[in-house]
Amino acid sequence: MKNIILLLAASFVFSSCSEKNYVIFSGNIANTKDTAMKIGNMNRDFQKEVSIDENGNFRDTLFITSPGAYSYQIGRSYAAVFFREGYDLNLSLDANDFFKSRKFKGKGSEVNNYHVARSALKNKLVGDAKAFFVVPIEDFMTKIDKNKDIFLDFLEASALKGQEKEIQRKIIEHDYLLTRYNYDKFNHYHTKIHPELPEGYYAPIIQMDLDDEVSFIYDRSYRNLIVENWRLTSKEAMEIDPSLTQVSFVKNKIKDIKSTIIKDLMVSMLFRQISLKNKNYKTDYPRILEMLTADQLKEKITAKFVGVQNTKPEMPAPNFNYENYKGGKTTLKDLKGKLVYIEIWATWCGPCIKEMPALTQLIKDFKGKNIEFVSISIDSKNDYEKWKKMVPEKNVGGTQLLADKGLKSDFMKAFSVGLIPRSILLNEEGEIITPKAPRPSADNTKSYIDSLLNRTIIKTKSMTKTMKL
């Protein structure tokens, strides 16, 4: 009996290994001080940290959730990599020249080296974004049509075959459509004028196939196009029927789509409906929840719903206990008795840094007033020294804190903080005035804070008068 069990166990191990539902990923990173590489996929159902030794070497077995496009991140630099079960892929790169130095060897190297070369070709053809997009529409169309042909010729000259080649051909097509879509956006960004577009300009995007699961797991441009298709078609549908809700629109749009992960992407775009700005968010929540299939997304929208419920105006804000730049720790309870204006930021967040001069001015404007300005950084442990360096460099003022677990800290999760910068206003009792306050640079921020302070003064005087009586 024992021999039979051992034989069955050996058979199971052999069977499991022979399927090779994993990728071996190894290599060397020159000139890096980082001790780990982060690997993940676009669905966010695979995330792993791979250790990098003191010589820059790494090696790990990755039990991937599906073939497709993944990303590897070292420090702040990251790039795409294609994984498929059975790949034995070796990567070498120089952290000082991250993108240009990438080279792959081993099984799976052909498609990944092709991708590196195609990315370099794209950078060369596009060049300066302003010069590329700010041209008459006729010239732009001629340019992207020509570039598409160049990319297709480049693919034909490669060694790729079969499905791998077809996947890359579709990537070229989707990249072309996304570039076409972005013309208006980039042109307007640089000129502040929306260019006149020919009739039917967006038709190829509106009429695109929304049920291509292979493209979905391999191609970020395809995912972005699904989002843009959603925006274009929802706008059109609501112009025809103003009574149509976003939730009803999505429910109708996904009914003929077979891919559950594509359906989930479309439904997840409704998460913004779970907001105090939407008076129907309580009834929208169960309708959105029932359309989702992924447990991860169900948990995410439920957490957001609970967060909105718990962070409504006049609700007590959750406490925090964060490191203070000046030493020790600061809790929200320590700030009780003052209005608290919280600005959530990070050293790597460009828009956050752009808000700093305005925040500095606010702190000066309200010096001596009953308000505390608190900047909370969500930087990771790896960026601790950057935070310590940037605080005195920018010299914003106020109270400078560092969240213990970044966006995963309880305070951040309670407020469903996803995008930064984010501003929050609390009253003297630590209760929420607004979970989304105007940014420091907004035109109405100063007058809004003034009105809150004046309200407090009037309330205090009224209480004092009552006590005397």
Residue ranges and their predicted role:
Residues 1-27, 452-456, 460-463, 467-469:
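Bacterial Sec-dependent N-terminal signal peptides
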Residues 17-167, 171, 178-196:
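A non-transmembrane, solvent-exposed segment enriched in polar/low-complexity residues
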Residues 244, 251, 261-323, 333-338, ...:
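N-proximal helix/coil linker or "cap" segments that precede and/or mark the start of modular domains
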Residues 323, 388-424, 428-429:
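Short, internal strand/loop/helix patches
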Residues 336, 344-361, 375:
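Conserved redox-active cysteine motifs that mediate thiol-disulfide chemistry
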Residues 356-377, 392, 447-448, 452-453:
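Conserved helix-turn-beta segment immediately C-terminal to the redox Cys motif
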Residues 370-384, 396-407:
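Thiol-based oxidoreductase modules, predominantly thioredoxin-like and allied folds used
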Residues 425-469:
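Thiol-/selenol-based redox modules, centered on thioredoxin-like
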